[in-house]
Amino acid sequence: MRVLITGGSGYIGRRLAASLAADQHEVISLSRRPETAPPQSGVRFIKWDARTAEGDWVNELAGAQGIVNLAGASIGKGRWTRQRMAQILSSRLSATSAIVEAINRTPADRRPSVLVNASGIDYYGNRGDELVTEESEPGDSFLARVSQQWEAAARQAQPLGVRVVLLRTALVFGRGALAFRLLTLPFRVFAGGPLGDGRQWFTWIHVDDHVGLYRLALENPQVSGPVNAVAPDVRRQREVAREIGRVLHRPAVVPAPTPLLRLVLGAQSHLLLDGRHAVPARARAAGYAFRFAGLHEALEDTLRAR
């Protein structure tokens, strides 16, 4: 099949593209700066501006079986000023609206059958000890509102006859994943420990399973709507800190107090202090078998492998 990937030059995009290309699928990666993207075997890079339904990529959409939308400003880079928060939202909405408009311009019999749109597990906000599935109500934090609006923009493809899957992703465990590197860095310098009181539930997913769920969404026509991209082994954050310390042979006793995190990070502290006990109900119902279902094995693979 032919698959287009927006944000394809990023960490997840390149991993997904490699997986698809290895199985002889035609992969087209859309990038604002394709000339700077490192070459990737079996992947063709095409320019797009992530704002308008114009350019060669629109022609490539005709006859494609699927499009994966990963485009959007990073939530982990830079302090969350008002300007940055507006950019986080607008970058996602403009890119997604451009995709939907391009689909609308494509003849009905040539449209992709599926749009797989990234979203975040922060959709649910801070949920305490509540068990969260794809049927749970949304939260009201900044990222919850971003996720809701992003998903609403993607759902506009449904009336056009396109199956829409919304991957609500937890923190990705991968050596090239920025958030994971930031999470584990304090432990490497003997300064790791719980964040806040450490009681918040911590959701995560290994990058191989993250890619696997994108493949499931692309290839299984029975999968639609929201899918929690989380591993089954959800833990309290303090347990995750201890496990990271154990794998790295480092102590996990230096806490980052809630007031300090809020003072230093402002609204961004919600990324570390909010939690939700989200489970992969729909992935399991679709028969997905996690390669890394347990926290320890996922950390061992990510932190110790070279």
Regions inferred by a protein language model and the residue ranges of each:
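Alpha-helical substrate-binding/gating segment
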Residues: 184-192, 200-234
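Mid/C-terminal beta-alpha module of Rossmann-like enzyme folds, strongest
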Residues: 220-267, 300-306
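C-terminal amphipathic/interface module of NAD(P)-dependent oxidoreductases
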Residues: 270-306
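Conserved beta-loop-beta element that borders a ligand/cofactor-binding pocket
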Residues: 119-120, 152-175
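Glycine/proline-rich active-site loop of Rossmann-fold NAD(P)-dependent oxidoreductases
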Residues: 148, 160-162, 173-182, 217-227
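NAD(P)H-binding glycine-rich loop region in Rossmannoid oxidoreductase-like domains
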Residues: 43-95
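N-terminal Rossmann NAD(P)H-binding glycine-rich loop of SDR-like oxidoreductase domains
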Residues: 3-23
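Conserved Rossmann-fold NAD(P)-dependent oxidoreductase catalytic core, especially the SDR/UDP-sugar
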Residues: 85, 97-141
